[in-house]
């Protein structure tokens, strides 16, 4: 069933005509031109990301420039698998985080990390002597009696196992962001590698995906810009536009509230919920000056948005950064350029 869906999905993206009419503010969807603008912004702010061409001209898509077919970042570390021990109780519990009070907005899924239901408790450390007698609680050995691990030598007869179990060991990932004409949103693909540099067997990449998303939000599919068939873990973009629309609306509402408070001479919190998010996004100016680039007459992104109404939006289309929360074990590089 997954093979049929993947084939149909690839054909839809390959043959669906790209729309060049912007509906970003109303739907959260973007055009190919806006995808390129957002990609340029991502590459500018985060140097670990780069544009890349398809491996062969036959794999190129006509709605994107040849040298900007997709975005890629390589050698992204992933040190732990998402097993039962990852992040405490991650994978055991989940909760839907609702929208604001009296809000009709949908919430989002938060998996794991519910410390209130599984509080961590410190356990007493107790010792056992050679006769098998358990020491009383609170008994503390003399520090001089505690063996120094640095003085212990490894037994030459012991074979050291570097794997440390079935689900451990560091991996690296290459992350790819493409444009989907069918969904009119970005789409992410991931290709994993073993510590020795060999590509992971496709199903092993699912060990780094949150359980509820496996084979639903994330499936194994061929990367469309490679000359040969290479299976990657692909994050479906079907809910990306609605989620972005909700984020845009909330950020705009926070910006409006912030301006109303400033106009009334009231103190504005520096990091309060979505209002704090809006403030941080505004600081992501291409010029790096920390000012609202929509007000800068020399802003190199002026060709993306010209309307005066842009001064009343918290997130511009070129700041449309792709967000993925289904891979918490993959350590994305958020180092920003200056």
Swiss-Prot record:
Active site: residue positions: 238
Region span, Flexible region: 85-167
Location in or out of the cell: Cytoplasm
Chain positions covered by the region annotation Disordered: 135-170
Record InterPro entries: Atg3/Atg10
Function: E2 conjugating enzyme required for the cytoplasm to vacuole transport (Cvt) and autophagy. Required for selective autophagic degradation of the nucleus (nucleophagy) as well as for mitophagy which contributes to regulate mitochondrial quantity and quality by eliminating the mitochondria to a basal level to fulfill cellular energy requirements and preventing excess ROS production. Responsible for the E2-like covalent binding of phosphatidylethanolamine to the C-terminal Gly of ATG8.
Subunit architecture: Monomer. Interacts with ATG8 through an intermediate thioester bond through the C-terminal Gly of ATG8. Also interacts with the 40 amino acid C-terminal region of the E1-like ATG7 enzyme. Also interacts with the ATG12-ATG5 conjugate.
Protein name per its UniProtKB record: Autophagy-related protein 3
Top-level taxonomy: Eukaryota, Fungi, Dikarya, Ascomycota, Pezizomycotina
Recorded name of the encoding gene: ATG3
